[in-house]
């Protein structure tokens, strides 16, 4: 099940499909990473006006309309879909956090102290790694460590 996105975001997906281009290609054209671009297409990140104008050129859609709908007045409503997720790929990521979340948390605390890994100041990368037993998916979360403050 694909999560519901706004009509403006649906226009982006339709234009992307019509052009037959990838998030990576769009990202290179507007100066952003493919994961960030995909996130913005789902309404989970916010394009600035310059990015929207570049995006409209890449996708060959109306700049005025997309800026009107996704410009300064629009803000993301982050978090899509049910918990637990029903999509198999998203569920496996969710399962990874359920199974390995506490061990990862313990190691973060051992290496950094009492705090969290930011998902706001975070870069995410998805790579394909060849392997004789079947290609591997490598997902990297590169988040800033934020120590808890004391007062």
From Swiss-Prot:
* Keyword vocabulary terms for this entry: Lyase
Annotated disulfide bonds: none
In this record, what's one Pfam family?
Cyanate_lyase
Superkingdom of this protein's organism: Eukaryota
List the InterPro entries: Cyanase, Cyanate_lyase_C, Cyanate_lyase_C_sf, CYNS_N, Lambda_DNA-bd_dom_sf
Q: What is its EC number?
A: 4.2.1.104
Instruction: Supply one GO molecular-function term.
Output: DNA binding
Q: Which reaction does it catalyse?
A: cyanate + hydrogencarbonate + 3 H(+) = NH4(+) + 2 CO2
**Function, in words:** Catalyzes the reaction of cyanate with bicarbonate to produce ammonia and carbon dioxide.
Q: What is this protein called?
A: Cyanate hydratase
Which gene holds the coding sequence for this protein?
CYN1
């Amino acid at each position: 099940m694909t999560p519901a996105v706004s009509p403006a975001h649906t226009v982006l997906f339709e234009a992307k499909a019509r052009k037959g281009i990838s998030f990576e290609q769009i990202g290179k054209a507007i100066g952003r990473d493919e994961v960030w671009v995909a996130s913005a297409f789902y309404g989970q990140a916010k394009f600035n006006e310059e990015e929207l104008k570049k995006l409209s050129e890449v996708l060959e859609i109306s700049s005025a309309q997309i800026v009107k709908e996704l410009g300064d007045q629009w803000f993301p409503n982050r978090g899509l879909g049910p918990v637990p997720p029903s999509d198999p790929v998203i569920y496996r990521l969710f399962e990874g956090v359920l199974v390995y979340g506490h061990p990862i948390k313990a190691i973060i605390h051992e290496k950094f102290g009492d705090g969290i890994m930011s998902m706001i100041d975070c870069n995410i990368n998805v790579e394909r790694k060849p392997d004789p037993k079947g290609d591997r998916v490598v997902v990297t979360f590169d988040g800033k460590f934020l120590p808890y403050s004391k007062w």
